[in-house]
Design a protein with these regions (language model features):
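Metal-dependent de-N-acetylase/amidase catalytic core
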Residues: 77-256
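Active-site rim/loop-helix segments in enzyme catalytic domains that contact anionic ligands
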Residues: 1-104, 131-138
Length: 256
């Protein structure tokens, strides 16, 4: 979906992929990420990159991951914000463009229907790939990454997953090289100290009901919520002294 997702969730297959398709580029309200992504794709070390370059929908913080509601476009976006309208429009654009890009493909590896760590645009890309691949014989595979925010969505997933599972060693050298490019261009979106797992697994999506399950090793990510900003004790004391001085001035008639 986004620049850097390809090395976070698909590093093991990246170098051998016939196409590496990035869906989104500009980020509303974040000029540094937008410019950095354009610079990174122009400097990308692998030649098979395809950049659809849609603008993201501004909905990252709109989802309550304790009660996500699936929709045809991915997830329902609460409220009537412009981000929700962009999200719906992006789905239609993705289906059209991916239909062209996936023509003739035998296998496509894309985001999971629960969005890995929890990203509504990842889920949207999965839905768009499934819609685009509907009229072809292309097999769709999803990565085995899940977080504490999305494990419930994985458990309740209505998408049929087949028995075929592929487990491969991650390509950590390539992943780190491309991560360095994103970091140099100030558009790396993941944890700075992230350590890739030794392996990652992919499971095929079935278009028919599946009676039997499969053993599927998944990588679990613990999402760390951002810590609230903290004021230093010195700043707190200075603000308290200033407030007391203002109160004293009011009481003696010197204030405005």
């Amino acid at each position: 979906a986004h620049p850097d997702d390809e090395i976070l969730w698909f590093s093991s297959i990246l170098a051998d992929a016939g196409k590496i398709i990035l869906c989104f580029e500009d980020v509303p309200g974040n000029r540094h990420w937008s410019e950095g992504r354009r610079a990174s794709t122009s400097q990308y070390p692998l030649p098979q990159l395809v950049n659809i370059a849609l603008s993201e929908a501004d909905i990252f913080h709109a989802i309550d991951w304790t009660t996500p509601v699936p929709s045809a476009e991915g997830l329902e976006i609460p409220g009537t914000s412009s981000g929700g309208r962009v999200y719906a429009d992006n789905f239609r654009r993705l289906v059209d463009r991916l239909g062209d890009e996936l023509d003739g493909c035998s296998n496509v590896f894309t985001h999971a229907p629960w969005g890995e760590y929890g990203n509504a645009e990842h889920i949207q890309v999965f839905r768009a790939v499934m819609a685009a691949a509907e009229s072809s014989s292309c097999r769709v595979w999803v990565p085995g990454y899940v977080s504490n925010a999305t494990v419930a969505l994985l458990t309740a997933c209505e998408v049929e997953l087949g028995r075929d599972v592929i487990t491969l060693p991650t390509n950590q050298a390539l992943a780190r090289d491309i991560a360095t490019l994103y970091k140099a261009n100030n558009c790396w979106t993941w944890y700075k100290d992230y350590q890739w797992p030794a392996q990652e697994s992919f499971r095929v999506v079935s278009t028919e009901p599946v009676d039997e399950g499969a053993i599927w090793p998944v990588n679990h990510i613990s999402i760390r919520p951002p810590a609230p900003p903290r004021q230093s004790p010195g700043l707190t004391r200075r603000l308290a002294r200033r407030f007391r001085r203002l109160v004293n001035r009011k009481e003696t008639g010197h204030g405005r």
